[in-house]
Amino acid sequence: MLTSGFLFSGSRSLFLEGLKNSFLDYRAVEVDGYLRENIKLWDKRSDITTEVNQKGAFVPEDKVEAFISLFSSFVGTLDTVVLSGRVPEGVRRDIYRILIERANEKGVKCILDGEGDLLLSGLEARPFLIKPNEYEFISAFAPKDGSLEEIAKRAKEIVRSGMTTMVSVTLGRRGALLTD
């Protein structure tokens, strides 16, 4: 397995320490600054989760282009690529589309777990599977009433359109919906 992305110099030792005893290889483009931190606060009584997401460091365009080049250099050696999460400030909003296109050129399956414009842009490149959570799916694809039946119907429409082979919508404690 391989992990790749931006390695922020201020968080370098933390990242490398985490990888030390893992089976993961990594290839990264180093960027000045610190990795953003995300904190989730869960109130057990009300069952409400509050997210506090920091911005993190800005990634200059030359580093983004260096990452696209790095990704292109190794993607053909992989069977499957997972592209997930938000991207740092400065990273172009069509980054997932570009990376999926590069992977598709090499016959590599892509799983896209993104939200908003990152998800919609990535979908243009026809990933093998998209995996938004319920909120992300409803926000991006606006099923009529947000019911499980409407989510399933809209997911099937997306697959039938040829934009992706499979859609998996995670539903928190209720599990997940998977359609092909």
What do these predicted ranges mean?
Residues L41-T77:
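Conserved phosphate-binding/catalytic loop of the ribokinase/pfkB sugar-kinase fold
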Residues V29-D47:
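Glycine-rich nucleotide/cofactor/substrate-binding loop typically near the N-terminus or early
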Residues V75-G90:
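Short acidic, glycine-rich surface-loop motifs adjacent to enzyme active sites
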Residues K55-A57, R86-E89, E136, R173-R174:
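Short glycine-rich anion-binding loops that position phosphate/pyrophosphate groups of nucleotides
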Residues D94-D180:
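Conserved phosphate/ATP/ADP-binding segment of small-molecule kinases
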Residues F6, E30-V31, W42, N53, ...:
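Short beta-strand segments
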Residues M1-L35:
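Substrate-binding N-lobe of the ribokinase-like
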